[in-house]
Amino acid sequence: MMFATTDLCDAHEDRLAAGTLRVLEPVFRPFGGVRRFAGPAATLKLFEDNSLVRTALEQDGAGRVLVVDGGGSLRCALVGGNLGKLAEKNGWAGIVVNGCVRDSDELAECRVGVLALAAHPRKSDKRGAGVSDAPVDVRGTRIVPGDWIYADADGVLVSDDALLE
């Protein structure tokens, strides 16, 4: 799917004004091997525990984007090389992490988009804590399962519905 977030913003100024198209804060860095990705959102809300991330990525991604609201924690990584490979294998379009990743070199080789706040060498806990498929608030932007995510080098858009066919 070819698109530019800049063009989508220009073409949908009415949606931006109405709040049905939103722009995430420009704080996410690219780590995956794919720099432009889009798809309907699947959501996770968790904190310093990536058990649910693995569970989600083990499912058929069907071109979806996994949005991981890790509370913005910079104390450990929620996605690493093994999970990047799992996302690629299972057909996920991308992962947006409000938190950290690790194994940056491995993630760069995965054919999946990965955006995160930073890299961190420490792994997360594995307690099975968190919530899946619920609305999340990522840095002030509400994302509900099924919202459309569009990401490229210029930013990340969240739309209530698909903007492209």
UniProtKB/Swiss-Prot annotation:
- What is the top EC class of this enzyme, as a single word? lyase
Q: Which reaction does it catalyse?
A: 4-hydroxy-4-methyl-2-oxoglutarate = 2 pyruvate; oxaloacetate + H(+) = pyruvate + CO2
| Free-text comment on the cofactor | Divalent metal cation.
Q: List its EC numbers.
A: 4.1.3.17, 4.1.1.112
Please report the organism this UniProt entry assigns to the protein: Burkholderia mallei (strain ATCC 23344)
Which residues hold substrate?
Answer: G80, G81, N82, L83, R102
Which cysteines bridge via disulfide bonds?
none
UniProt-recorded name of the protein:
Putative 4-hydroxy-4-methyl-2-oxoglutarate aldolase
What cofactor is this protein dependent on?
A: a divalent metal cation
Annotated positions binding a divalent metal cation: D103
Question: Any idea which UniProt keywords this protein has?
Answer: Lyase, Metal-binding
The task this protein performs is described as:
Catalyzes the aldol cleavage of 4-hydroxy-4-methyl-2-oxoglutarate (HMG) into 2 molecules of pyruvate. Also contains a secondary oxaloacetate (OAA) decarboxylase activity due to the common pyruvate enolate transition state formed following C-C bond cleavage in the retro-aldol and decarboxylation reactions.
